[in-house]
């Protein structure tokens, strides 16, 4: 693949992704959560060589609509690699339990992190899928939802106790 080929890249992570590539005149790239940017194949290739770069490419960033670039940079990837936020929401709401279990087993870490976040935000109503998340990822969706609700409740100030018996 030619280094100047333009490739769309999505940050599927919940937070920002930032990387520096010294070989490209100190290029610093920042992706906000859910942001799509167009970068060159050369940039992604150089990113893969720096420490932590492959982890960013596999878990946080998604190469969109370019199977050749995915193949050259990452080799074989599971179908779950290309799941976007909307794909995950659809799987959680409408997918079968077997599809969901496959996703938990084979998806990159960025997808499983997004599943944890979305299971609380949506919230995930399927008890079997909640149990699967707990078994596969060790994340208790029920407790996370309970804690989130407790944190959202206003803090009640305790009133000063009043004497029941008045001595004069």
Model-predicted segments: where are they?
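Compact, well-ordered interaction domains used in eukaryotic information-processing assemblies
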Residues: 1-79
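Charge/polar-rich, low-complexity and marginally structured segments
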Residues: 81-168
């Amino acid at each position: 693949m030619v280094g100047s080929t333009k490739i769309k890249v999505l940050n599927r992570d919940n937070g920002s992704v930032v990387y520096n590539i010294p070989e490209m005149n100190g290029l610093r790239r920042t992706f906000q959560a859910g942001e799509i940017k167009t970068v060159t194949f050369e940039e992604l290739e150089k990113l893969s060589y720096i420490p932590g770069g492959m982890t960013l490419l596999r878990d946080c960033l998604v190469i969109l609509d370019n199977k050749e670039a995915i193949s050259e940079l990452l080799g074989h990837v599971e179908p779950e690699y290309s799941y976007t936020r909307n794909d995950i929401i659809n799987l959680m709401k409408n997918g079968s339990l077997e599809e969901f279990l496959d996703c938990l087993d084979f998806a990159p870490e960025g997808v499983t992190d997004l599943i944890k976040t979305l299971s609380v935000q949506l919230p995930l109503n399927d008890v079997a899928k909640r149990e699967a998340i707990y078994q596969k990822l060790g994340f208790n969706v029920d407790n996370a939802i309970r804690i989130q609700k407790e944190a959202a409740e206003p803090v009640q100030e305790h009133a000063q106790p009043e004497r029941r018996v008045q001595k004069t």
